[in-house]
From Swiss-Prot:
GO terms for molecular function: ATP binding; ATP hydrolysis activity; ATP-dependent DNA damage sensor activity; damaged DNA binding; single-stranded DNA binding. PANTHER family: MITOCHONDRIAL DNA REPAIR PROTEIN RECA HOMOLOG-RELATED, RECA. The gene is recA. This is Protein RecA. SMART domains: AAA. Residues 326-374 are annotated as: Disordered.
Amino acid sequence: MAGTDREKALDAALAQIERQFGKGAVMRMGDRTNEPIEVIPTGSTALDVALGVGGIPRGRVVEVYGPESSGKTTLTLHAVANAQKAGGQVAFVDAEHALDPEYAKKLGVDIDNLILSQPDNGEQALEIVDMLVRSGALDLIVIDSVAALVPRAEIEGEMGDSHVGLQARLMSQALRKITSALNQSKTTAIFINQLREKIGVMFGSPETTTGGRALKFYASVRLDIRRIETLKDGTDAVGNRTRVKVVKNKVAPPFKQAEFDILYGQGISREGGLIDMGVENGFVRKAGAWYTYEGDQLGQGKENARNFLKDNPDLANEIEKKIKQKLGVGVHPEESATEPGADAASAAPADAAPAVPAPTTAKATKSKATAAKS
Protein backbone atom coordinates (compact mmCIF):
# COMPACT_ATOMS: atom_id res chain seq x y z
CA MET A 1 0.00 0.00 0.00
CA ALA A 2 2.81 2.34 0.92
CA GLY A 3 4.43 1.63 -2.45
CA THR A 4 1.23 2.57 -4.28
CA ASP A 5 0.99 5.86 -2.36
CA ARG A 6 4.59 6.68 -3.23
CA GLU A 7 3.94 6.00 -6.92
CA LYS A 8 0.83 8.20 -6.85
CA ALA A 9 2.79 10.98 -5.16
CA LEU A 10 5.54 10.70 -7.78
CA ASP A 11 3.04 10.75 -10.67
CA ALA A 12 1.38 13.83 -9.16
CA ALA A 13 4.77 15.57 -8.82
CA LEU A 14 5.69 14.71 -12.43
CA ALA A 15 2.35 16.04 -13.67
CA GLN A 16 2.80 19.28 -11.71
CA ILE A 17 6.34 19.75 -13.08
CA GLU A 18 5.06 19.27 -16.64
CA ARG A 19 2.27 21.81 -16.09
CA GLN A 20 4.68 24.34 -14.60
CA PHE A 21 7.73 23.87 -16.84
CA GLY A 22 6.29 22.31 -20.00
CA LYS A 23 6.15 18.85 -21.55
CA GLY A 24 9.50 17.08 -21.58
CA ALA A 25 10.88 18.97 -18.57
CA VAL A 26 11.02 15.66 -16.70
CA MET A 27 10.42 12.09 -17.87
CA ARG A 28 11.37 8.50 -17.26
CA MET A 29 14.49 7.65 -19.21
CA GLY A 30 12.76 4.65 -20.79
CA ASP A 31 10.19 7.00 -22.38
CA ARG A 32 12.93 8.96 -24.11
CA THR A 33 13.70 8.05 -27.72
CA ASN A 34 17.32 6.92 -28.07
CA GLU A 35 18.40 8.39 -31.39
CA PRO A 36 21.90 7.73 -32.76
CA ILE A 37 24.40 10.52 -32.12
CA GLU A 38 24.48 12.93 -35.06
CA VAL A 39 27.97 13.95 -36.13
CA ILE A 40 29.88 16.30 -38.41
CA PRO A 41 32.80 14.55 -40.20
CA THR A 42 36.22 16.05 -39.51
CA GLY A 43 37.69 15.47 -42.98
CA SER A 44 40.02 12.74 -41.68
CA THR A 45 38.73 9.15 -41.63
CA ALA A 46 41.35 8.24 -39.01
CA LEU A 47 40.13 11.00 -36.68
CA ASP A 48 36.47 10.11 -37.28
CA VAL A 49 37.32 6.55 -36.19
CA ALA A 50 39.31 7.77 -33.16
CA LEU A 51 36.32 9.85 -32.05
CA GLY A 52 34.31 6.62 -31.94
CA VAL A 53 31.10 8.00 -33.45
CA GLY A 54 32.28 9.00 -36.93
CA GLY A 55 32.92 12.69 -36.36
CA ILE A 56 32.32 15.65 -34.04
CA PRO A 57 29.06 15.16 -32.07
CA ARG A 58 26.15 17.55 -32.66
CA GLY A 59 24.82 19.71 -29.84
CA ARG A 60 28.06 19.60 -27.83
CA VAL A 61 31.00 21.80 -26.87
CA VAL A 62 34.29 20.79 -28.53
CA GLU A 63 37.76 22.17 -27.75
CA VAL A 64 40.62 21.95 -30.25
CA TYR A 65 44.00 23.03 -28.89
CA GLY A 66 47.68 22.72 -29.73
CA PRO A 67 50.89 24.66 -30.47
CA GLU A 68 51.13 27.31 -33.16
CA SER A 69 50.82 26.11 -36.78
CA SER A 70 49.73 22.63 -35.72
CA GLY A 71 46.58 22.56 -37.87
CA LYS A 72 43.87 23.72 -35.44
CA THR A 73 42.12 26.11 -37.82
CA THR A 74 42.62 23.77 -40.79
CA LEU A 75 40.91 20.90 -38.96
CA THR A 76 38.06 23.19 -37.94
CA LEU A 77 37.59 24.57 -41.46
CA HIS A 78 37.23 21.01 -42.77
CA ALA A 79 34.43 20.46 -40.24
CA VAL A 80 32.85 23.74 -41.42
CA ALA A 81 33.00 22.58 -45.06
CA ASN A 82 31.46 19.20 -44.21
CA ALA A 83 28.64 20.82 -42.21
CA GLN A 84 27.88 23.10 -45.17
CA LYS A 85 27.96 20.20 -47.65
CA ALA A 86 25.28 18.50 -45.54
CA GLY A 87 23.10 21.61 -45.96
CA GLY A 88 23.89 23.16 -42.57
CA GLN A 89 24.32 26.78 -41.53
CA VAL A 90 27.70 27.68 -40.02
CA ALA A 91 28.99 30.76 -38.19
CA PHE A 92 32.65 31.65 -37.64
CA VAL A 93 33.52 34.06 -34.82
CA ASP A 94 36.98 35.29 -35.81
CA ALA A 95 38.23 36.88 -32.59
CA GLU A 96 41.82 36.71 -33.88
CA HIS A 97 40.86 38.64 -37.06
CA ALA A 98 43.04 36.20 -39.00
CA LEU A 99 40.70 34.07 -41.15
CA ASP A 100 41.98 33.73 -44.73
CA PRO A 101 38.91 33.42 -47.00
CA GLU A 102 40.97 32.13 -49.95
CA TYR A 103 42.44 29.30 -47.87
CA ALA A 104 39.00 28.48 -46.46
CA LYS A 105 37.65 28.30 -50.01
CA LYS A 106 40.41 25.85 -51.02
CA LEU A 107 39.34 23.56 -48.17
CA GLY A 108 35.78 23.47 -49.50
CA VAL A 109 34.17 26.18 -47.34
CA ASP A 110 31.30 28.06 -49.00
CA ILE A 111 32.55 31.50 -47.97
CA ASP A 112 29.57 33.27 -49.58
CA ASN A 113 27.17 31.62 -47.12
CA LEU A 114 29.50 31.46 -44.11
CA ILE A 115 28.29 33.78 -41.32
CA LEU A 116 31.35 35.73 -40.14
CA SER A 117 31.80 37.90 -37.06
CA GLN A 118 34.97 39.78 -36.08
CA PRO A 119 34.10 41.16 -32.62
CA ASP A 120 35.89 43.95 -30.77
CA ASN A 121 36.11 42.23 -27.38
CA GLY A 122 35.35 39.00 -25.55
CA GLU A 123 31.97 40.08 -24.14
CA GLN A 124 30.75 41.06 -27.61
CA ALA A 125 32.00 37.80 -29.12
CA LEU A 126 30.30 35.57 -26.56
CA GLU A 127 27.08 37.62 -26.67
CA ILE A 128 27.00 37.09 -30.45
CA VAL A 129 27.61 33.36 -29.92
CA ASP A 130 24.74 33.20 -27.40
CA MET A 131 22.30 35.00 -29.73
CA LEU A 132 23.21 32.85 -32.75
CA VAL A 133 22.93 29.60 -30.79
CA ARG A 134 19.55 30.58 -29.28
CA SER A 135 18.20 31.30 -32.78
CA GLY A 136 18.21 27.52 -33.34
CA ALA A 137 19.19 28.05 -36.97
CA LEU A 138 22.85 27.01 -36.78
CA ASP A 139 24.45 23.59 -37.12
CA LEU A 140 27.98 24.65 -36.20
CA ILE A 141 29.62 27.70 -34.67
CA VAL A 142 33.39 28.17 -34.41
CA ILE A 143 35.17 30.49 -31.97
CA ASP A 144 38.77 31.24 -33.04
CA SER A 145 40.23 31.55 -30.50
CA VAL A 146 39.62 31.52 -26.73
CA ALA A 147 42.93 33.35 -26.15
CA ALA A 148 41.69 36.24 -28.32
CA LEU A 149 38.49 36.74 -26.28
CA VAL A 150 39.91 39.76 -24.48
CA PRO A 151 37.63 41.24 -21.76
CA ARG A 152 36.42 44.79 -22.39
CA ALA A 153 38.05 46.04 -19.16
CA GLU A 154 41.44 44.85 -20.39
CA ILE A 155 41.06 46.58 -23.76
CA GLU A 156 39.92 49.86 -22.18
CA GLY A 157 42.54 49.76 -19.40
CA GLU A 158 46.21 50.68 -19.45
CA MET A 159 48.82 48.28 -20.86
CA GLY A 160 50.33 47.40 -17.47
CA ASP A 161 47.03 46.93 -15.57
CA SER A 162 46.38 43.59 -13.89
CA HIS A 163 43.11 41.79 -14.73
CA VAL A 164 43.45 38.50 -12.90
CA GLY A 165 40.80 35.90 -13.73
CA LEU A 166 38.66 38.19 -15.91
CA GLN A 167 38.79 35.96 -18.99
CA ALA A 168 38.20 32.79 -16.94
CA ARG A 169 35.07 34.32 -15.34
CA LEU A 170 33.86 35.46 -18.76
CA MET A 171 34.25 31.96 -20.24
CA SER A 172 32.60 30.33 -17.23
CA GLN A 173 29.55 32.58 -17.46
CA ALA A 174 29.23 32.15 -21.23
CA LEU A 175 29.45 28.35 -21.11
CA ARG A 176 26.82 28.18 -18.36
CA LYS A 177 24.47 30.14 -20.61
CA ILE A 178 25.01 28.44 -23.97
CA THR A 179 25.46 24.74 -23.07
CA SER A 180 21.74 24.04 -22.68
CA ALA A 181 20.87 26.01 -25.83
CA LEU A 182 23.49 24.07 -27.81
CA ASN A 183 21.93 20.75 -26.81
CA GLN A 184 18.36 21.85 -27.57
CA SER A 185 19.24 23.31 -30.99
CA LYS A 186 21.70 20.50 -31.91
CA THR A 187 24.35 23.16 -32.57
CA THR A 188 28.00 22.21 -32.15
CA ALA A 189 30.35 24.86 -30.73
CA ILE A 190 34.05 24.41 -31.53
CA PHE A 191 36.39 26.50 -29.39
CA ILE A 192 39.93 26.76 -30.78
CA ASN A 193 42.44 27.29 -27.98
CA GLN A 194 46.12 28.07 -27.57
CA LEU A 195 48.74 26.68 -25.22
CA ARG A 196 50.59 28.48 -22.44
CA GLU A 197 53.25 27.24 -20.02
CA LYS A 198 52.88 27.25 -16.26
CA ILE A 199 55.92 28.68 -14.47
CA GLY A 200 57.80 26.59 -11.92
CA VAL A 201 56.34 23.17 -12.78
CA MET A 202 58.87 20.51 -11.75
CA PHE A 203 56.89 17.35 -12.55
CA GLY A 204 54.32 16.66 -15.24
CA SER A 205 53.49 18.76 -18.27
CA PRO A 206 53.87 22.53 -17.82
CA GLU A 207 51.42 23.15 -20.68
CA THR A 208 47.95 24.52 -20.05
CA THR A 209 45.20 26.07 -22.16
CA THR A 210 43.89 29.63 -21.82
CA GLY A 211 40.51 30.72 -20.48
CA GLY A 212 40.45 28.91 -17.16
CA ARG A 213 39.04 25.50 -16.25
CA ALA A 214 35.40 25.97 -17.32
CA LEU A 215 35.96 24.92 -20.93
CA LYS A 216 37.71 21.73 -19.80
CA PHE A 217 34.61 20.77 -17.81
CA TYR A 218 31.94 21.81 -20.33
CA ALA A 219 33.65 20.29 -23.40
CA SER A 220 32.32 16.87 -24.43
CA VAL A 221 35.33 16.38 -26.71
CA ARG A 222 38.85 17.80 -26.35
CA LEU A 223 41.36 17.33 -29.17
CA ASP A 224 45.10 17.84 -28.73
CA ILE A 225 46.62 18.42 -32.18
CA ARG A 226 50.39 18.32 -32.81
CA ARG A 227 52.70 18.53 -35.82
CA ILE A 228 55.03 15.50 -35.64
CA GLU A 229 56.85 15.55 -38.99
CA THR A 230 57.45 17.75 -42.02
CA LEU A 231 56.49 16.19 -45.35
CA LYS A 232 58.97 16.91 -48.13
CA ASP A 233 59.04 16.60 -51.90
CA GLY A 234 62.79 16.47 -52.47
CA THR A 235 64.07 19.40 -50.42
CA ASP A 236 60.79 21.35 -50.49
CA ALA A 237 58.42 21.15 -47.52
CA VAL A 238 54.92 20.33 -48.85
CA GLY A 239 53.02 19.61 -45.64
CA ASN A 240 52.95 18.23 -42.12
CA ARG A 241 52.29 14.85 -40.59
CA THR A 242 49.84 15.56 -37.79
CA ARG A 243 48.80 13.58 -34.72
CA VAL A 244 45.54 14.24 -32.88
CA LYS A 245 44.87 12.77 -29.44
CA VAL A 246 41.32 12.61 -28.10
CA VAL A 247 42.12 13.63 -24.50
CA LYS A 248 38.46 13.80 -23.46
CA ASN A 249 35.41 12.12 -24.97
CA LYS A 250 31.96 11.91 -23.38
CA VAL A 251 30.37 10.06 -26.32
CA ALA A 252 32.93 7.24 -26.81
CA PRO A 253 36.09 5.84 -25.18
CA PRO A 254 38.79 8.57 -24.92
CA PHE A 255 42.59 8.62 -25.34
CA LYS A 256 42.59 7.32 -28.91
CA GLN A 257 44.97 8.80 -31.48
CA ALA A 258 44.84 9.53 -35.18
CA GLU A 259 47.54 10.53 -37.64
CA PHE A 260 47.04 12.19 -41.02
CA ASP A 261 48.75 14.49 -43.53
CA ILE A 262 48.02 18.20 -43.88
CA LEU A 263 49.26 19.49 -47.24
CA TYR A 264 50.06 23.19 -47.60
CA GLY A 265 47.35 24.98 -49.55
CA GLN A 266 45.17 21.84 -49.68
CA GLY A 267 44.38 20.95 -46.08
CA ILE A 268 43.85 17.43 -44.73
CA SER A 269 44.71 14.74 -47.28
CA ARG A 270 41.62 12.53 -47.08
CA GLU A 271 42.97 10.18 -49.74
CA GLY A 272 46.30 9.77 -47.94
CA GLY A 273 44.43 8.88 -44.77
CA LEU A 274 42.32 6.32 -46.64
CA ILE A 275 45.47 4.65 -47.99
CA ASP A 276 46.97 4.43 -44.48
CA MET A 277 43.73 3.12 -42.96
CA GLY A 278 43.16 0.77 -45.90
CA VAL A 279 46.59 -0.84 -45.47
CA GLU A 280 46.12 -1.05 -41.69
CA ASN A 281 42.73 -2.78 -42.02
CA GLY A 282 43.63 -5.06 -44.92
CA PHE A 283 41.56 -3.46 -47.69
CA VAL A 284 44.53 -1.94 -49.52
CA ARG A 285 47.54 -4.16 -50.16
CA LYS A 286 51.06 -2.71 -50.17
CA ALA A 287 53.65 -4.72 -52.09
CA GLY A 288 56.95 -2.88 -52.27
CA ALA A 289 56.12 0.62 -53.48
CA TRP A 290 52.84 -0.45 -55.15
CA TYR A 291 49.40 0.00 -53.59
CA THR A 292 46.65 -2.39 -54.74
CA TYR A 293 42.91 -2.49 -54.04
CA GLU A 294 40.87 -5.56 -55.04
CA GLY A 295 43.31 -6.46 -57.80
CA ASP A 296 43.47 -2.92 -59.18
CA GLN A 297 46.73 -1.06 -58.71
CA LEU A 298 46.30 2.43 -57.30
CA GLY A 299 49.82 3.57 -58.10
CA GLN A 300 53.51 3.29 -57.36
CA GLY A 301 54.32 5.27 -54.23
CA LYS A 302 51.87 6.91 -51.86
CA GLU A 303 51.73 10.18 -53.79
CA ASN A 304 50.62 8.46 -57.03
CA ALA A 305 48.09 6.33 -55.14
CA ARG A 306 46.79 9.49 -53.45
CA ASN A 307 46.35 11.22 -56.81
CA PHE A 308 44.62 8.15 -58.26
CA LEU A 309 42.03 8.16 -55.46
CA LYS A 310 41.57 11.91 -55.85
CA ASP A 311 40.77 11.36 -59.54
CA ASN A 312 38.42 8.48 -58.65
CA PRO A 313 36.25 9.75 -55.76
CA ASP A 314 33.78 6.84 -56.03
CA LEU A 315 36.60 4.40 -55.32
CA ALA A 316 37.76 6.53 -52.37
CA ASN A 317 34.20 6.59 -50.98
CA GLU A 318 33.97 2.81 -51.35
CA ILE A 319 37.20 2.27 -49.38
CA GLU A 320 36.07 4.73 -46.70
CA LYS A 321 32.69 2.98 -46.35
CA LYS A 322 34.33 -0.43 -45.94
CA ILE A 323 36.76 0.88 -43.32
CA LYS A 324 33.95 2.47 -41.30
CA GLN A 325 31.77 -0.64 -41.61
CA LYS A 326 34.57 -2.88 -40.37
CA LEU A 327 35.30 -0.60 -37.42
CA GLY A 328 31.61 0.03 -36.69
CA VAL A 329 31.94 3.79 -36.96
CA GLY A 330 29.45 6.08 -38.70
CA VAL A 331 27.13 3.15 -39.51
CA HIS A 332 23.59 3.25 -38.13
CA PRO A 333 22.27 0.07 -36.50
CA GLU A 334 19.57 -0.35 -39.17
CA GLU A 335 22.25 -0.32 -41.90
CA SER A 336 24.15 -3.08 -40.12
CA ALA A 337 20.94 -5.07 -39.71
CA THR A 338 20.05 -4.88 -43.40
CA GLU A 339 23.57 -5.85 -44.46
CA PRO A 340 24.62 -8.58 -42.04
CA GLY A 341 27.29 -9.91 -44.36
CA ALA A 342 28.76 -6.56 -45.29
CA ASP A 343 31.82 -6.88 -43.07
CA ALA A 344 32.62 -10.39 -44.26
CA ALA A 345 32.09 -9.45 -47.89
CA SER A 346 34.25 -6.36 -47.63
CA ALA A 347 37.00 -8.22 -45.80
CA ALA A 348 37.13 -11.04 -48.36
CA PRO A 349 39.21 -9.20 -50.98
CA ALA A 350 41.73 -8.21 -48.29
CA ASP A 351 42.08 -11.82 -47.11
CA ALA A 352 42.48 -13.06 -50.65
CA ALA A 353 44.93 -10.37 -51.75
CA PRO A 354 48.15 -11.84 -50.29
CA ALA A 355 47.52 -15.11 -52.16
CA VAL A 356 47.63 -13.33 -55.52
CA PRO A 357 51.16 -13.07 -56.93
CA ALA A 358 52.30 -9.52 -57.56
CA PRO A 359 53.25 -10.08 -61.25
CA THR A 360 49.75 -11.38 -62.08
CA THR A 361 48.11 -8.34 -60.48
CA ALA A 362 50.46 -6.02 -62.30
CA LYS A 363 49.58 -7.58 -65.69
CA ALA A 364 45.87 -7.43 -65.00
CA THR A 365 46.00 -3.70 -64.31
CA LYS A 366 48.86 -2.56 -66.52
CA SER A 367 46.93 0.31 -68.04
CA LYS A 368 45.78 1.65 -64.66
CA ALA A 369 49.25 1.37 -63.19
CA THR A 370 50.75 3.27 -66.11
CA ALA A 371 48.19 6.03 -65.71
CA ALA A 372 48.79 6.28 -61.98
CA LYS A 373 52.58 6.26 -62.37
CA SER A 374 52.49 9.06 -64.92
